[in-house]
Amino acid sequence: IAIRKRILQRGLSFAPQATIANGDHIYWDLHTWQGEQAGELSAQGRQSNFDFANRVLGGSNEMALKLAAGPQIVPLYGTTFRSTPIYFLQDDHDHWENDSPLTYPVPWFQLQLARTTQQLYYPEFLPDANRSVGLPYSTTSERGELSESFGTLRYGDLLEVLLYDVRRTLNVGDLNSVFLDRTVENWLAERTASTD
């Protein structure tokens, strides 16, 4: 944490207009993918004692999530970016696993861990009039039209950066393997070709 914090402080010393935190916010792999115990719960997975058949929020699962994720996120970010907008993307470790073809698609419980970690510790992407309706994990709720995986960073007419995480719809293990969901691919192509 100390090294990552120094790197962030160094970046902030340049007074950026915005910051993108590009995933791997937590390291708490539930399974091990090498050696004799491949596919089995890791030491951290056993320690967390998650009830994979139960929901994440409420009870022991929420407590285990907070004990694992909180100490890795809160001390690092805290109020450091209170004057600089920060956009959070998720990566493999944020789904509580190291990247492996054996882990896709992301198991339901681990997807719920990732979603809950995001809801508790870093914001979803704000509404965007140019974001396609129907993108996966983008919803309309009492909190507005938020997206867990797709956002846009704009700097006037100079720059538009499309931010996206395809990990939740990535499927490399089946005959119908897909890297980009068709709706996501269309959104990326439309925004890239757009002049507005």
Model region roles, listed by residue range:
Residues 1-196:
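Metal-dependent phosphoester/phosphodiester hydrolase catalytic core
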